[in-house]
Amino acid sequence: MKRTFSGLLAAAALVSLSSPVHAAGTYAATQYPIVLAHGLMGWDTAAGIDYWYGITGDLKSNGAKVYTTKVSAVNSSEVRGEQLVQQIQTILAVTGAKKVNLIGHSQGNQSVRYAAAVIPNQVASATSVSGTTGGSPVADIIAGVAPGGSFTNVVLNAVIGGLGQLIDLFSGSPGLPANGNAVLTSLTTSGAANFNRNFPQGVPTTRCAQGAAVVNGVRYYSWSGTGLITSGLDISDYPLAGTALAFKGQPNDGLVGQCDSHLGVVIRSDYALNHLDTINHFFGVTGRVDPVALYRQHANRLKNAGL
């Protein structure tokens, strides 16, 4: 069954979950469990819709033990990172595993990096998918039109916070703290730069380069795309093509720039995928690149690395 952790759950409740399903294949059978961390406005399962659409099931069918986590849909990367750390501790306690392989999408990049920095002895790898290592100029623009203390900022904070709480409610995690201003600050280029100073592990020291492959025993990886209109049938393509204008012609996926997504070993950062394609949304309608296969291949990469 799907293993979902909404906030820090009691270990006794987790133990009551059914035993892991024995998978038919072993291609993705990593030594350590794979733990998925969602991005901004994210969820695990909400109203029957998986954030990691088709990804968890494919990994399991190829032998992986996969856990999806649920942190605040809207909050600072530090708050979300600490929530993730607590859930990792629970997963380790229940499974008996010594470490986990973390994969974070979008703002989940900062969540997994926080966890890897705080508990490196319990993290085998940290992988960023379409991650906000360098922040986003889209967040810069929003912050610019709604400066702190302004009426616009008050309204925007209320709207973003309210949406986050609604997502948390529908995903079965009501009561998680929400802070629109905090998340906006985290995702601006200046906010990301500050986060990088505090958590530099795996961050490239030269723009557009790769970062350190291993820091404190944790392996760092990343991949992302530069696609926009990747499928005419995917309605999310069109707003992402609009937000892409914020990048002034630089390669991007609609929300994150190509170079700003780099972390550790860059597997590839120019897939024909946009920001939502990399989690196989909306509902598996993507272009010529299969995003599900990328996760399967990465699990095999981790397996072959002894992770």
Language-model segments: which ranges?
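C-terminal catalytic-base region of ester-bond hydrolases, centering on the histidine
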Residues: 205-307
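Active-site catalytic motif of lipid deacylating hydrolases and related acyltransferases
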Residues: 25-100, 148-156
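Serine-hydrolase catalytic core
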Residues: 173-231
